[in-house]
Amino acid sequence: MNQASQHKPRVFVDADVLFAGAASPSEHGASLTILRLAEITLIEAVTSHQVITEAERNLEEKLPMALPAFRLLVSRCLRVVADPRPEDLGAWAGMADPQDLPILVAAAHEGCPWLVTFNVRHFQPGHPDVTVLRPGDLVLRVRELLAGLE
């Protein structure tokens, strides 16, 4: 990993955020804004193969016309990492819904202090090293940080 990426905020992106970003009717939605922040290298957006598969499956079922935008966003904005192995999940049992546990573990293993999702309740009680928040809340935090540069 290059030195510049070590100083960028690292954010793990869940499938619902990818879906919302790809399907966004506006350029100003929080999900798409987060992906654009990654595209212009202000943050490092990370996700896992499980997340990509889930988002793509949901888009195929509900909004197939958004698939080209989704694939472009994935290629330009995200670093996609391997899913945790099943044997790596045991120590994390009970920290998130069983279906979402691999996502929480992947976020922690990748050193992402933030996991962005609309399904915050699925990641409760969570892990102390990963703050789970909605896309709009992350955008507000970024805005506050930028305002502090004055």
Regions found by a protein language model. Name each.
Residues 78-115, 120-121, 149:
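Active-site neighborhoods of divalent-metal-dependent phosphate/nucleic-acid chemistry enzymes
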Residues 10, 44, 115, 130-131:
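A residue-level structural signature of the nucleotidyltransferase/glycosyltransferase Rossmann-like core
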Residues 17-18, 51, 103, 121-122:
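Alpha-helix capping/helix-boundary segments
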Residues 36-91:
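PIN-domain endoribonuclease scaffold, especially VapC-family toxins
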Residues 1-45:
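Short, well-structured N-terminal submotif of metal-dependent ribonuclease cores
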Residues 22-23, 59, 127:
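Short, flexible helix/strand-to-coil boundary loops that buttress conserved ligand/catalytic motifs
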Residues 13-15, 48, 119, 134:
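A secondary-structure boundary/capping signal
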Residues 101, 113-114, 120-150:
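Acidic, PIN/NYN-like endoribonuclease modules and their adjacent C-terminal/linker elements
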